[in-house]
Each structure stands twice: as C-alpha cells, then as structure tokens.
C-alpha cells in the first residue's frame, strides 16, 4: 500500500478533502481535490463499514440527535481555512450545540454488552472547536489535516483546562474500555499506524479515559459507584471548552466532587461500572443532596446552639433564689428601733429616718452595741449553716451584670452629655442673676473675665453662641477677655473701670452689669455695629439679650 509522508503537517492531504462514513446513512460526495490518499481512506472507510453493518439503525438515530449547524470561530490562524471548508459541508460536519465546545466521539451504544469487554463500534465525529481524534482507525484522517498546537508539542491531544465548570460536574469516559491502573505515563510517544504508516497518538483506552462533563449534562450524573461509563440507550455528552484529559490514570476532580469520592476511593480502586443512569436524567441523591443540603445546615447549627446555651444559662441563673447577706449589728439595731422612730417622728422619708437611727446608734455605749454585735455573729453562723457555698460576691456580680445589660450605648452618650452640661450650671446662674453688682460680677471666679483669663479653655460649641460669655471661648474674644481681666484686677469698683474702657463703650454701658453676649465676640469687621446696638439691647430683660443675639 502506498505510504504517506509523515514529515510535513499540512501536506499530508488536500486542504479541501472531505471524509464520509457510510454508516451515517449519508451519500458520499467526493471533492475534486482528493489526491494520493484516496486508497488509504477507502480502506479506513471499508473497515468501519464492515464493523458497523449490524448497527446502522442506531447510527441513524444518533444522526437525528445531532444539533443544528452553528458557526464556530477559530482562534488559531492555521485553522481559518479549515474552519471555512468544514462549515461549507453541513451534511457531515455540523456545528456544536454550544460555541467553543470541543470534539466529541459517539460510539455505537447498541453494541455494548459488557462494559469491561473492549469493542470497536462505529464512530461518528462532530466538529467542535478542538479536534480530539484519538481513534486508531481514523489516524489518517487526523494527520491528513493540519496538526493542532497540542499535536505539535507532544503528539498527545490535550485541550485546555476549563475555567467555568459546574461545581457538580463529575468525570465521564468517552471510551468503552476501562483503563488499566498500572499503565505508566511513559507510553505517550507516538505510534505508527499499520495501514497508513503515519505517526498517531496512542489509543484512548491506554490513557486515562476521563473527561469532565459539560454544564448542560450536570442533570445526568451517574451513581457514584457506577463510574463514568455510559450504558446502553444513553447518549454521550459534549465536553466543556478546553476539557483537559489528565495524562495520569488518577481522577482529576473539582473541589465539590473530591470531597465525595477522593476521600473514599484511591485513584486505582475505582470499582467497575455496572450502574446505569436514571431514566429521567436526574442525578442520584447520593451525589447532590449530601453536599448541597448539609453545608448550609452545618453553618447554621453552631450559632443556634450557642444562642440556646446562653439562654439556658441565663434562665438557670434567674431560677436561683436571691440569698440576702446576713444582717450586721447596725442593721439589727435599725430593724428593732425603726418602728419606734417612725412612731415618734412625723417624717415618712426613709433617708431621714435612717439618719436619725444612725445618730442614735452612735450615741449608744459600747455595752449596748455589744448586744447587737453578738446577735450579728449568731446571724452569720446561722446563714453559713443554711447556705454553706454562699458568698457576697454572688450578689454583687449579678448586680453588675444587670447594669451592663440594661445600659446601652445611647444611654452612655446621654449621661456623658448631661455631665458636660452640669459643669457649666454655676456660671450660668451667676450670669443670669440681674441683682448681682458689677463689682461682684468682675471679682467672682465664675465671672466671664475669670473664665476666659486662662487660654487653655476648650473651644466653643454650637450651643454656646446663645449663652453668656462664660461658656464662649472663641479666639476673637481672647484679647477683650484678657483686657477685662486686667482691668478687673486693677480697679475693683465700677467707677474706676469706666475710665479705662475704650471710648466707644462709654459710661452708659456700665450703669448695670454688662451682659457679655456673643454680639461683642463677633469678628472685627462686625464689631462697631454690635457695639452700637448694645444700648438698645440693655433695655430688654437679660434672658432676651441672649436670644436676640442669635
């Protein structure tokens, strides 16, 4: 038989060469460019026809399952002409159901009698993005075309690893033969086809025959023990884009399937396939339900248990009776004398009654108090006998816990603001009293000048603008406040102060205490109009002066 030259890639056959298999029920069409490889291709087709004469009906049904043609886009520059040639002949090469899905080999499913016995069914090839021509009977067909980038590297048809596989995608074989676990990866060297003499990769049965499922085939996952070989009457599945065939016999799984299978089975101990898929295409519940349903429940159980345990502990603490501490000597005296004091006095307040009882207790002599101390000692002994494990820390600890639970961050902020306001109350009272004389107003430590004499006072807040000067510490008013403090130290009387004040202020302003409001502390540009308005503001009551200054 004539031998083809195996050295050149694109020169093995004509570029427009088309191949037909008679078992597909289609008529042969010969292209005008078929060359010297016609005899070898006829031998290949005749061998396929002889093997598949009894299975033509199944092959026809497979042709009917084929999806409608769809345009695919080839990224490598070397495949542009080949893609155009394949798309013209839609009778044999038909487009993939999903753009970019790789090559697929469909065996004759009707001829499978035992999954462990290798058979040679008729092979139908669909054109996908990356051709995987691994059958020994079609090596001439594969090598007649331009080699793929994977073929140029190591003569092994390898496709890129998928990047968007479905999390429940297991592995599935496209061959009817079970792999031999002891086959080393060193057999990947190219072999010589006995008919054509063209180098070809080894038979897929010699490699690990496992490919990932496509996302559309997730609903047809087999039983985990019936591994990965399609049974009679079940169609094969398309391979996801760039499906990667592992060179080792080990199973390359994703993260979700490795938790189910890899932890229980070593790669060389996968049982022989003997279970078929569900007829409805629904995966076995042993695959889906343990992973999907148990993961969220495991995350939700722990917080619920912790919440329940905390509630149970709190309820147990509440159920325990509150044990009062034993009474001391003074408490025993109060218990005895309280009724007498209430009868003698008309006071009903508990604090006043306790003060009276305290004075009487201290007025007692040592001998009279010793009686109550003895009663208190007996009380402690009785309490220790009734509650041997009791300690005063139990009650104090409970009180602290209750306070922490009741106190919220809003209440803490509220108490802080209240404390800040209380600090300024004395200065407000001194400024609000109109009866205070001018001398006392300047000499008292709560006066505005004394409050502003130290430059370390904090900055004024927004609420202090409507208040007198004692609460206002704006930088513009520092000079005026220091001058007022200096004058107050030199002249305690109002008459001497009037001579030192500047002329715009004048003596009419000192006829009564000066309400140093925020109008005096305005910026320098607004200072003269504010001083002119001061005589008008003095005719109003003092609370209105602070309001009108806003």
UniProtKB/Swiss-Prot annotation:
Chain residues forming the annotated DNA-binding region: 323-391
GO biological process: canonical Wnt signaling pathway; regulation of transcription by RNA polymerase II
Residues covered by region (Interaction with CTBP-B): 407-550
Residue span of region Interaction with AES and TLE4-A: 109-311
One of the Pfam families matching this protein, by short name: HMG_box
Xref: CDD domains: HMG-box_TCF7-like
Reported function: Participates in the Wnt signaling pathway. Binds to DNA and acts as a repressor in the absence of ctnnb1-A and possibly ctnnb1-B, and as an activator in the presence of these proteins. Required early in development for the establishment of the dorsal body axis in response to maternal Wnt signaling.
Protein name: Transcription factor 7-like 1-D
Organism listed in the record: Xenopus laevis (African clawed frog)
Gene from which the chain derives: tcf7l1-d
